[in-house]
């Protein structure tokens, strides 16, 4: 019985905290190119995800087209996240910074982006599956949205 207690003690104080700590401090740094088409409207952008220690930022840079009109997109979405279980992450936007070169009208942004990308204190769930040590598939609901290439 003493051996079992000693083994449990060793496993708990050496192995388990490392596993818990690894889940709490997921570090993800990757970049995805994404195109979105809604009728005559199109967005082509690069999304850079930087996540570590329950906070992160998504840097968005690209262009949007509506007929002959062309708009620049340049935004930074700062957020906190919580790993709910497995690969399920709940993100909460903290600050959304629109860079001066961003010319996308707010109405068009609202029509084509979830509010998480536009306003503070908005929530969004992502499934983030590791493909290998650096790359990830990021899904919204059950639809893969980004293949994110790591560094």
Residue ranges and their predicted role:
Residues 127-129, 133-149:
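Short, exposed beta-strand-loop hairpins at the edges of beta-sheets
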Residues 44-89:
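Extracytoplasmic/periplasmic/luminal assembly and interaction segments
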Residues 72-120:
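Structured, soluble extracytoplasmic/luminal domains of envelope-associated proteins
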Residues 41-42, 67-74, 101-105, 147-151:
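A short, polar/proline- and glycine-enriched secondary-structure boundary/capping micro-motif
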Residues 24-45:
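Tryptophan-anchored aromatic micro-motifs
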Residues 23-31, 54-59, 89-90, 131-137:
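Short, hydrophobic/aromatic-rich segments at coil-to-beta transitions
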Residues 2-21:
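Hydrophobic membrane-insertion alpha-helices, especially the h-region
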Residues 35-37, 60-67, 94-101:
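Short, solvent-exposed aromatic-acidic interface loops
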